[in-house]
């Protein structure tokens, strides 16, 4: 799963803490947050100091202003308190994105990299698949490998350094792959994709073993050309000012 804030944002013109809390947004800029998702419910408000994720309990459009009401309901476990203060004119509102990437079969039976976008509607309790359908991203992707780069300090009681010294699988994260602390010390991701051609190749296939991020892959003898593509992704917010 990949969670991030949208590149598009709208100006926050007013903010009041409490339960409910209210956030006023510039109505002229609001459409940029609904262009990719007509009814977003999960947002992030951020300035140069901090960021807070929340679910909108209700969204009301007025004259020049969109007002978002936030209550301790739905997926919100706590209310906005006095520590969550954002000055008008300095904070921006972002749509919070949640994507899952996975390998599946498309309607033609071909292996494909899919992307599913999830949302929680304003005031709702359940996470739903946006549009009800997953999106085909790349056809021909047969395998996906992931490795995670962790900070040199994995003890949650100590401050992170921003220095990476370990590349691990999801099951091998320190101090515990099932805890939030281990994932919060991830500062980078390595991605490996095995992609195959649509047709059989005329050239003779190589005999050397195929590896993706160090994992040896067993390939079928179907005559198709295959190649592995690898990349490194740095999580800048974890590496700088964590």
Q: What name fits each language-model region?
A:
Residues 1-78:
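Autoprocessing Asn-cyclization modules and mimics
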Residues 74-75, 86-114, 119-242:
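Short linear sequence signals and composition-biased patches located at protein termini or domain-edge surfaces
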């Amino acid at each position: 799963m990949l969670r991030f804030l949208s590149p598009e944002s709208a100006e926050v013109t007013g903010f009041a803490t409490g339960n409910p809390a209210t956030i006023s947004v510039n109505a002229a800029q609001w459409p940029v947050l609904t262009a990719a998702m007509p009814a977003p419910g999960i947002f992030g408000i951020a300035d140069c100091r901090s960021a807070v994720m929340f679910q909108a309990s209700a969204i009301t459009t007025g004259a020049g202003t969109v007002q978002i009401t936030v209550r301790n309901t739905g997926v919100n476990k706590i209310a906005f308190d006095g520590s969550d203060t954002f000055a008008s004119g300095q904070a921006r509102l972002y749509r919070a994105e949640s994507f899952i990437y996975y390998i599946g079969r498309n309607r033609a039976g071909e292996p494909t990299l899919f992307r599913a976008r999830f949302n929680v509607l304003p005031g709702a309790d359940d996470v739903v698949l946006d549009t009800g359908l997953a999106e085909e991203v790349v056809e021909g992707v047969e395998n996906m490998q992931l490795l995670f780069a962790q900070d040199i300090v994995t003890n949650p009681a100590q401050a992170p350094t921003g220095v990476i010294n370990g590349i691990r699988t999801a099951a091998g994260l320190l101090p515990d792959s099932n805890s939030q602390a281990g994932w919060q010390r991830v500062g980078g991701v390595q991605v490996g994709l095995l992609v195959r051609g649509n047709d059989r190749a005329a050239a003779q296939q190589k005999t050397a073993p195929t590896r993706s991020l160090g994992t040896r892959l067993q390939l079928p003898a179907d005559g198709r050309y295959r190649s592995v593509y690898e990349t490194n992704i740095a999580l800048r917010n974890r590496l700088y000012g964590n």
